[in-house]
Amino acid sequence: MNDQGIKESIETLKEQIRKYDYHYYVLDEPLVPDAEYDRCFKALQQYEEQYPQFLSPDSPTQRVSGTPSDAFMPVAHKQAMLSLSNVFTTDELKAFIKRAIEKLDEPNQQLVFACEPKLDGLAVNMTYEGGILTHAATRGDGAVGENITANIKTIASVPLRLRVSNPPKLIEVRGEVYIPKADFEAYNARARELGEKTFANPRNAAAGSLRQLNPEISASRPLAIYCYGIGACEDYKLPNSHLEQLNLLKEFGFRVSPETRRAVGVEGCLDYYQYMLAKRNQLPFEIDGVVYKIDSISLQQQLGYVSRAPRFACAHKFPATEEMTRLIAVDFQVGRTGAVTPVARLEPVSVGGVTVSNATLHNFDEITRKDIHIGDTVIIRRAGDVIPEVVSVILEKRPANARKIELPKNCPVCGSEVVREADEAIARCVGGLYCKAQLKRMMWHFASRKAMYIEGLGSVLIDQLVDEGIVHHLADLYELDLQTLANLPRMGEKSAKNLLSALEKSKKTTFNRFLYALGIREIGEAGARVLAEHYCDVESLKAATIEELMTLNDIGPVAASHIVHFFAQAHNLEVIDRLLELGIHWPKPEKIQVNQQNPFFGKTVVLTGTLSTMGREEAKAKLLALGAKVSGSVSSKTDYLVAGSEAGSKLVKATELGVAIIEEDEFLKWVNS
């Protein structure tokens, strides 16, 4: 047989096995006996061993790599994998849908939702180029995940090649990897028989199995996957419906949950929630709630995102698993901002497969409202199936010697006064950086990956540096020397050099990361990014007023007040000045000369409808570059309304108020002039 004949035989076998895999793993409809499948598979293996020039990465034989990886490499997602905001009650769901409707151009409309079970597994992103699986990654931080390509290939229901003749140039497919309940129980039973470690729950089992350096271990675990969405997609027209996109994924060869449903409005969503809640225990996989997504992709794009979550989707969590135990003591922890948080110490109890011995009491308002005493028998719940909390007290079991929980007058760490403002539920230590607990938490935050990212500066080393009086302020970190570090327990010269190198590397940063690292109350990553976009340096931000700050997106009155207060404190400015003197720097944005004669300069502009030549974010960026202020709502202060096709209520309101209306053609002339 010549090369062409051999290649054709290999392709025929590959196509046959793909067909068998699809019917067996996706449709649950085996086409041939196992023996026949094994014969085909063996024949393909023999061909590829004899003629390795015809071995391709999409071959069914390549699902398991024989060489374990040394580490997981980072992989950037083309489109961010954002987490969902959670709702726990009917009122929260109604509020979520109301907020979404109010932000739409046509607010008086009945929304259609795609409803899906929320699997309790591990989210993954699979990238296909030209129809072939090229890499897969975990969610990671939403922007960058870990490369688990070899491990994903061990899941038989993941197609290595899309089942279409005209695939997208590139497509990201998102899914949830899980282990079915029955397989989980069987795996643990075998592990117990062999004296091996068992998993606490199916989610841990799935995550631990997928993140194995040796993919052969992943292959030995009963992993499965359901796909729930599409990320980036190039050179392919996708349907304008999430449900239709899920059907497209099925055509591509992916498994999609058969429990996906269409629902209309709040009542439709609640009906689905009750349906899945009743069915939860009968499902072959673990779920911890349901997910609602507005079905229209164009409406999704119109709503966009807030911080790290979409405005068009949310997770409706089921009531978490609850257990009963005794509260034996209360400790107080001090956080980065001085918040004194009560923590319940409990008689250990298993809740949802996890042994719980500590639980949050939130704050003293909650303690008073629930009438919690030391010695009480309490109900523990894993809130969101993650953070254990004390839900309530069983009063009839209260012992005679039960004691009230008292707010400490002094910080349990530094002895400073603990105060509680009249309008706040949280009590705070006033010790500031004098308080070792606050300094430690502040240093940990400052060094974290999303802030200054000082690799190697972990909590154990921070404890040593603070407890031994080596570091008193954040800036002291950048004056550490080799001898001091090398003499610390468990450090040595090599570790000390690595830390000094990491400190030096961290000096080159960005303004938004630096602002986030400072730990200003109420300012997270998103808020720091907004501030950095509007103020290029500390001096200009120091001069900002509360009123000015409140004009920025995502900066409300409380956050604005904390920003102004932070930069009004002399000791904060001293630390910042010292950090800058020690070499922390970031690229200065180039000054753009704005033509003040352009018609948008200094004007308030609102965008509505769909522009045929660019997306809304691009149009907004062009307007901002021209010195305009872009607003999300029409008012008497609006100067121009840029109206694309399908403009809705904003156009009506602008007409009523006499606001100048600009069509797309005129808008393009103005921005390009």
Curated annotation (Swiss-Prot):
<comment type="similarity">
    <text>Belongs to the NAD-dependent DNA ligase family. LigA subfamily.</text>
</comment>
<dbReference type="InterPro" id="IPR001679">
    <property type="entry name" value="DNA_ligase"/>
</dbReference>
<keyword id="KW-0436">Ligase</keyword>
<feature type="binding site">
    <location>
        <position position="139"/>
    </location>
    <ligand>
        <name>NAD(+)</name>
    </ligand>
</feature>
<keyword id="KW-0862">Zinc</keyword>
<dbReference type="InterPro" id="IPR013840">
    <property type="entry name" value="DNAligase_N"/>
</dbReference>
<dbReference type="InterPro" id="IPR018239">
    <property type="entry name" value="DNA_ligase_AS"/>
</dbReference>
<dbReference type="InterPro" id="IPR013839">
    <property type="entry name" value="DNAligase_adenylation"/>
</dbReference>
<dbReference type="GO" id="GO:0046872">
    <property type="term" value="F:metal ion binding"/>
</dbReference>
<dbReference type="Pfam" id="PF22745">
    <property type="entry name" value="Nlig-Ia"/>
</dbReference>
<feature type="domain" description="BRCT">
    <location>
        <begin position="595"/>
        <end position="673"/>
    </location>
</feature>
<feature type="binding site">
    <location>
        <position position="414"/>
    </location>
    <ligand>
        <name>Zn(2+)</name>
    </ligand>
</feature>
<feature type="binding site">
    <location>
        <position position="317"/>
    </location>
    <ligand>
        <name>NAD(+)</name>
    </ligand>
</feature>
<feature type="active site" description="N6-AMP-lysine intermediate">
    <location>
        <position position="118"/>
    </location>
</feature>
<feature type="binding site">
    <location>
        <position position="293"/>
    </location>
    <ligand>
        <name>NAD(+)</name>
    </ligand>
</feature>
<dbReference type="Pfam" id="PF14520">
    <property type="entry name" value="HHH_5"/>
</dbReference>
<dbReference type="GO" id="GO:0003911">
    <property type="term" value="F:DNA ligase (NAD+) activity"/>
</dbReference>
<dbReference type="GO" id="GO:0003677">
    <property type="term" value="F:DNA binding"/>
</dbReference>
<feature type="binding site">
    <location>
        <begin position="83"/>
        <end position="84"/>
    </location>
    <ligand>
        <name>NAD(+)</name>
    </ligand>
</feature>
<dbReference type="Pfam" id="PF03120">
    <property type="entry name" value="DNA_ligase_OB"/>
</dbReference>
<keyword id="KW-0235">DNA replication</keyword>
<dbReference type="GO" id="GO:0005829">
    <property type="term" value="C:cytosol"/>
</dbReference>
<dbReference type="InterPro" id="IPR012340">
    <property type="entry name" value="NA-bd_OB-fold"/>
</dbReference>
<keyword id="KW-0520">NAD</keyword>
<dbReference type="Pfam" id="PF12826">
    <property type="entry name" value="HHH_2"/>
</dbReference>
<dbReference type="InterPro" id="IPR010994">
    <property type="entry name" value="RuvA_2-like"/>
</dbReference>
<dbReference type="InterPro" id="IPR004149">
    <property type="entry name" value="Znf_DNAligase_C4"/>
</dbReference>
<dbReference type="InterPro" id="IPR004150">
    <property type="entry name" value="NAD_DNA_ligase_OB"/>
</dbReference>
<feature type="binding site">
    <location>
        <position position="116"/>
    </location>
    <ligand>
        <name>NAD(+)</name>
    </ligand>
</feature>
<dbReference type="GO" id="GO:0006260">
    <property type="term" value="P:DNA replication"/>
</dbReference>
<dbReference type="InterPro" id="IPR036420">
    <property type="entry name" value="BRCT_dom_sf"/>
</dbReference>
<keyword id="KW-0234">DNA repair</keyword>
<dbReference type="Pfam" id="PF00533">
    <property type="entry name" value="BRCT"/>
</dbReference>
<feature type="binding site">
    <location>
        <position position="176"/>
    </location>
    <ligand>
        <name>NAD(+)</name>
    </ligand>
</feature>
<dbReference type="Pfam" id="PF03119">
    <property type="entry name" value="DNA_ligase_ZBD"/>
</dbReference>
<dbReference type="InterPro" id="IPR001357">
    <property type="entry name" value="BRCT_dom"/>
</dbReference>
<dbReference type="Pfam" id="PF01653">
    <property type="entry name" value="DNA_ligase_aden"/>
</dbReference>
<protein>
    <recommendedName>
        <fullName>DNA ligase</fullName>
        <ecNumber>6.5.1.2</ecNumber>
    </recommendedName>
</protein>
<dbReference type="InterPro" id="IPR003583">
    <property type="entry name" value="Hlx-hairpin-Hlx_DNA-bd_motif"/>
</dbReference>
<keyword id="KW-0460">Magnesium</keyword>
<keyword id="KW-0479">Metal-binding</keyword>
<dbReference type="GO" id="GO:0006281">
    <property type="term" value="P:DNA repair"/>
</dbReference>
